[in-house]
Design a protein with these regions (language model features):
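Juxtamembrane intracellular "pre-TM" segments in multi-pass secondary transporters
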Residues: 44-75, 254-255
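C-terminal membrane-cytosol helix-exit motif in multi-pass small-molecule transporters
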Residues: 24, 29-50, 235-240
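Helix-to-loop junctions at the C-terminal end of transmembrane segments
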Residues: 16, 116-128, 213-214
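Structural signature of the two symmetry-related core transmembrane helices
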Residues: 26-29, 131-146, 226
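A membrane-interface helix-boundary motif in multi-pass transporters
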Residues: 16-30, 211-228
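Extracytoplasmic gate region of multi-pass secondary transporters
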Residues: 67-106, 113
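Intracellular juxtamembrane helix-capping segments at the cytosolic ends
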Residues: 169-182
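Small-residue (Gly/Pro/Ala) motifs that create kinks and tight helix-helix packing interfaces
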Residues: 4-16, 90, 204-213
């Protein structure tokens, strides 16, 4: 998923440079149709019964679990912050006349994301999530600030690498903690909650930041995103203080 969020915008940015917007929409349609076709051949596992033999609840309320909600909220704020990058990088780069640098931003993001994910999972499993989460939140914050105040191609590429390290490395840890916070028969609910939080953060973040662009400009939406990352870190710290040490599902399994 992380690479898809990079490859798609990278292709879109390069098509935008040639004003191939119609072709871009047709490409998105083709990929969506391919996804639907592939989903038809996926085998869905049967509903797992609880230990007492009862079936899990289905419906809207089954999408939430109180134990997992705090970590989902942190994930929401993280993705909300990243929405400004995903939705407005091309427009921001065009305003700065840095369209080529925007493509390189995404390449740097992908490269550093793949490099860091090779070892951050092991660090989380051996030492604990805080040794990954707090440094990554700091790096993500710096990356957003660097992007907001960029004045050239080099700074934009550096910000891409920093955001790849920060946002790209910390999201699997949050997924691990959401799953680890619930009972085994609720792992599916927790996993669904994680992705719902990401989708909501991306959609609501793009909508709200889109309304902010005209009054404050693109630079300030990235500064606002950095503030939200700090808020997410504070919420995470409070939650970890309440829970203390908690056993984790192996993070490497989620990478």
């Amino acid at each position: 998923m992380g690479l898809a969020m990079v490859v798609g915008p990278w292709i879109g940015l390069n098509m935008a440079r040639w004003n191939a917007f119609t072709a871009a929409f047709w490409l998105c349609t083709a990929v969506a149709v391919l996804g639907i076709v592939l989903s038809l051949i996926v085998t869905v596992p049967p509903v797992i019964h609880h230990a007492d033999g009862s079936r899990p609840n289905l419906g809207f309320t089954a999408m939430f679990d109180r134990a997992a909600l705090p970590f989902a909220l942190v994930t929401f704020f993280m993705t909300f912050s990243y929405a400004g990058v995903s939705a407005f990088l091309a427009l921001y780069a065009r305003e700065l006349d840095l369209m080529a640098a925007a493509s390189n931003f995404l390449l740097c993001y992908a490269i550093f994301l793949m490099i860091c994910r090779t070892f951050t999972g092991n660090i989380c499993d051996k030492k604990g999530p805080k040794y990954v989460v707090y440094p990554c939140l700091l790096v993500f914050t710096i990356g957003l600030l660097a992007l907001g105040y960029t004045n050239g191609s080099i700074i934009m590429m550096i910000s891409g690498g920093l955001i790849g390290i920060g946002y790209g490395s910390v999201t699997p840890v949050f997924q691990t903690q959401i799953i680890s916070s619930v009972e085994p028969h609720k792992i599916g609910v927790a996993n669904s909650l994680f992705f719902n939080a990401m989708d909501a953060g991306m959609a609501i973040g793009a909508f709200i930041m889109g309304m902010m662009v005209e009054p404050v400009g693109y630079r300030m939406i990235y500064v606002a995103g950095a503030v939200l990352v700090i808020l997410a870190g504070a919420l995470y710290a409070v939650q970890m203080k309440k829970r203390g040490a908690m056993p984790l599902v192996s993070t490497s399994e989620l990478h």
